[in-house]
Structure formats: C-alpha cells, structure tokens
C-alpha cells in the first residue's frame, strides 16, 4: 500500500518515520520530496578495470567534492545525496523517483529501493542528458514514495550504508582498503 500524505504525517507524529530537516513542502500527496545535498562524486573516465575482488582506491575511479552548484555533463555518471536524513520503520520501504521537472531535462536515475529500516541520507546515481544541466543544492530533486509492507521485515536493513551522511562510495572499496 502506498502511503498518502495523511499516513506520512501520522508516522512523523508518532516518531516511526524521521525526516530531518523537515520542510513545509517535503510531505506531498503520496510521498516525500527530498532536496539535493552539496556533495558529489563524478565517475572518472578510465580504461582501468574496477575489480571488486582486488585492492583498490576509490580515488582511481571517482572525483569527489562539494559545491554550491553541480553541473552534470552529457552522459556523465555522478553520485549525489539528499539533504534530508531519513529513518524508515521496519514496516515501510521507499521507492526513489526523480521529480518530473528534472526528468524533463533528460537527467536519469536508475530504479532505487530504500529498504525497510534504513537510516541515513540517500546516495543516488544520476546520469546526464545530451547537454550539461546545472543543479543547485537545496532544490527539490527526488520524490520518495513510501510503501507499507504487509508485515514488518523480519530483518530490517542494518547494512554498511546505515547512518550514511553525504555521498557514500560502493562498499567494495571499504572492504578492500582497510
């Protein structure tokens, strides 16, 4: 069942759902509008193979930083994050969508599920369109549809990305670098 604005406000009121900061326009008819954060990681162009079983450094494949504006180049892949820190209860999952306005610029994001029990800022992959697009931190960028599970998850999310802030690179680097 997709949660309505009324359902979402009820979960916020009892503390089962947390969204920080929570702006007046965050709760929408059937989900949450989330704002773009300042951090980014650009995928570097390289002929080097990223081998998940070999030691490596994320610096070989990503260039990370922060900015007051973020330009996504044509066909460029980037990792971005939300301003909001969220906490989902063990009986709610989320489906991440790009807000329609941004999709109309040609920017694309892959299908992304937020697992029941997840807590943190969302890291999202963005793929550029046929021309550069400038993004501004603080703009409403993603729409998170919340779905109530038929029963609570037996094992809510407790993975490596739990509690993340800013852009989090793939966990395979953490496994191989220390």
From Swiss-Prot:
Protein species of origin: Aeropyrum pernix (strain ATCC 700893 / DSM 11879 / JCM 9820 / NBRC 100138 / K1)
GO biological process: dUMP biosynthetic process; dUTP biosynthetic process
UniProt function note: Catalyzes the deamination of dCTP to dUTP.
Gene3D superfamilies in the record: 2.70.40.10
Record-stated family: Belongs to the dCTP deaminase family.
Protein name: dCTP deaminase
One Pfam entry name: DCD
Protein's UniProt keywords contain rRNA processing: no
Known partners and oligomeric status: Homotrimer.
Active site: 125
Binding-site list for dCTP: 99-104, 115, 157, 164
Keyword annotations of the record: Hydrolase, Nucleotide metabolism, Nucleotide-binding
Enzyme class per UniProt: hydrolase
Annotated EC: 3.5.4.13
Pathway where this protein functions: Pyrimidine metabolism; dUMP biosynthesis; dUMP from dCTP (dUTP route): step 1/2
GO MF assignments: dCTP deaminase activity; nucleotide binding
InterPro entries attached to this UniProt entry: dCTP_deaminase (IPR011962), dUTPase-like_sf (IPR036157), dUTPase_trimeric (IPR033704)
Catalytic reaction list: dCTP + H2O + H(+) = dUTP + NH4(+)
């Amino acid at each position: 069942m997709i949660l309505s604005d009324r359902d979402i406000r009820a979960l916020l009121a009892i503390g089962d759902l947390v969204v920080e900061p929570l702006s007046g326009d965050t709760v929408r008819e059937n989900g949450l509008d989330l704002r773009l954060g300042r951090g980014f990681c650009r995928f570097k162009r390289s002929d080097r193979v990223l081998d998940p079983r070999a030691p490596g450094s994320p610096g070989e494949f990503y260039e990370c930083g922060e900015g007051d504006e973020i330009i996504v180049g044509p066909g460029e892949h980037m990792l971005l994050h939300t301003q909001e820190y969220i906490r989902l209860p063990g009986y709610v999952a989320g489906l991440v969508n790009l807000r329609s306005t941004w999709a109309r610029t040609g920017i694309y994001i892959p299908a992304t599920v937020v697992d029941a029990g997840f807590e943190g800022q969302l890291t999202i992959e963005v793929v550029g369109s046929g021309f550069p697009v400038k993004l501004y931190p603080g703009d409403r960028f993603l729409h998170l549809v919340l779905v109530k599970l038929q029963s609570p998850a037996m094992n809510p999310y407790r993975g490596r990305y739990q509690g993340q802030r800013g852009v989090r690179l793939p966990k395979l680097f953490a496994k191989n670098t220390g």
